[in-house]
Amino acid sequence: CNTAIECIDKLRDTMQSHERCSVVEVMGRRAGHLALQVGCAVGATAICLPERQLDFDTEIVERMRIGRIKGRNHHIIIVAEGYGSAQDVADQIHEATGIDTRVTILGHIQRGGSPSAMDRVMATRMGYAAVRALMEGKTNRVVVSDNNIVTDIDIEEGLAQSKDLNQCLFEAQQTVAI
């Protein structure tokens, strides 16, 4: 997440000075959690997630129009790779608004970068929980963090779980983005 945010912060400088729209594709083939986190952190105008289809005219074009009225001279649209083609989104934006729109696909660069302090602390906590489970004789377990509580669960239970999109965060981003 941090690497994507750093890249987008650098893109923002160019977008502002040239009054452009930047469509940025981030990882998320089957889930939009990363795209949502990144979009919130960078103040994206819109976030395209595989979990939900957008009404293009109201959730992108209209938001861009309102942003222009309020003085925003650039836009960042985050697209999770599972949503669809970032280039198609950019082409639709340019066609609907006439705004110069560029695509950046972050790809595997997102896998690199230094861990944050939170990442390092979480790794310590999860590593400790894994060793503790082994010392207790537990097998076929996976260490998880649920609401910042680290524990171990049966691996089959872990594999069967899915993580729902954070609707509250999505709604907050939709509200404050313009």
Give the positions of each predicted feature.
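Phosphate-binding loop/pocket of nucleotide- and phosphate-handling active sites
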Residues: 141-178
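Accessory alpha-helical/coil subdomains and C-terminal extensions
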Residues: 1-100, 104
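Gly/Ser/Thr-rich helix-start
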Residues: 29, 33, 108, 114, ...
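Acidic, glycine-rich active-site loops and adjacent beta-strand->loop/helix elements
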Residues: 28, 53, 108-110, 148-149
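Short active-site-adjacent structural elements
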Residues: 86-88, 111-114, 149-154
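Catalytic, metal-anchored helix/loop core of enzyme active sites in primary metabolism
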Residues: 92-99, 109-124, 134-135
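Glycine-rich phosphate/adenylate-binding loop
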Residues: 118-144, 148-151
